[in-house]
Amino acid sequence: KLLEGTFWEKQEYHNISESTMRSLLRRYSGTQAVSNFRPTAAALMYDKFLEKASPLFGTKAGTTWDMSCGYGGRLLGAIAADVNYIGTDPCTETFEGLKQIKEDWAGLNRTIELHQVGSEEFWPDKNSIDLCFTSPPYFDWEKYSEEETQSYKKYPEVQDWIDGFLWHTIDKCHYGLKIGGILALNVANTKRIKNFEEVTVRIAKEIAYKHIDTWKLQLSSQTGTP
């Protein structure tokens, strides 16, 4: 399935250990994280846009904010790429899984910071983030739970969701990003929001982002299509 990744500025690739990635995939292949967003694809994004810690060159690991963690695919990618990760997600069940991943794989060279809250309510530290990267929920297409904290429950109408969830999430990314930082959103038009891609770009420009590029990202197939 092709999804559009929309980006708002680039770097060198870091060689990901194949044995490490295989270990991660074996450990968590029973969850939806691997099929929902491949850790390998996430790791490549981090390799492209984030610095790596290097005592030799005096660089520190970059920081990414995953605004909608889901089942942890991007978290696993951040672990493999050895970068700092901030994650937000309101779903109780998936959040427990994210905490288990952190417990199993947290290392000395990276920080993993998890918050059980919707991204539209989370205030990151100002100018502290290098990359904001996620696949936002497609309104009520992705229902991780029936909890009232879910964005489709809090904002039950499409326009309310766009104004209340999507706009405020993109705005808080702008607050947290460093100058020259990147916002990368994996979005696609859906039956419920037929112009989702256009709306996302419009909101970002209104908030003062500069639209740099749009990529086509090949993801593993999922049940149904948005």
Go through the PLM ranges and name each one.
Residues 1-226:
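Class I S-adenosyl-L-methionine-dependent methyltransferase catalytic core
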